[in-house]
């Protein structure tokens, strides 16, 4: 369950720090969040798809690592990102 190229380009454009930015932690977290949300919808109808569930858990762990890195490097960017993506309650 991947996202389309158009959707990915839109996510990159919305979260890029400057033009051509595709590798910053903000962009990577936003892409992972979009993929995680897509897989979450997939699991509502395919409850026993354990192969994809493993991929989901790996994505969640990767996102957690990137968020930890960003919080350590720049707290302000971290707070802005989680507010924008709605990750924390």
From Swiss-Prot:
One of its GO terms (cellular component) is cytosolic small ribosomal subunit. Keywords: Ribonucleoprotein, Ribosomal protein, RNA-binding, rRNA-binding. The keyword DNA-binding does not apply. CDD domains: Ribosomal_S15p_S13e. Residues 1-26 are annotated as: Disordered. Residues 1-21 have a biased composition (Basic and acidic residues). GO terms for biological process: translation. It comes from the Bacteria. One of the primary rRNA binding proteins, it binds directly to 16S rRNA where it helps nucleate assembly of the platform of the 30S subunit by binding and bridging several RNA helices of the 16S rRNA. Forms an intersubunit bridge (bridge B4) with the 23S rRNA of the 50S subunit in the ribosome. NCBIfam families: S15_bact (TIGR00952). Belongs to the universal ribosomal protein uS15 family. This is Small ribosomal subunit protein uS15. The lineage of its organism: Bacteria, Pseudomonadati, Pseudomonadota, Alphaproteobacteria, Sphingomonadales. The gene is rpsO.
């Amino acid at each position: 369950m991947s996202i389309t190229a158009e959707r990915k380009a839109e996510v990159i454009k919305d979260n890029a720090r400057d033009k051509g930015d595709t590798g910053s932690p903000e962009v990577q977290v936003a892409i992972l969040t979009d993929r995680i949300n897509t897989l979450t919808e997939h699991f509502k109808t395919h409850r026993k798809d354990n192969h994809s569930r493993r991929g989901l858990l790996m994505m969640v762990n990767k996102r957690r690592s990137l968020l930890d890195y960003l919080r350590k490097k720049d707290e302000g960017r971290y707070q802005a990102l989680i507010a924008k993506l709605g990750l924390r309650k």
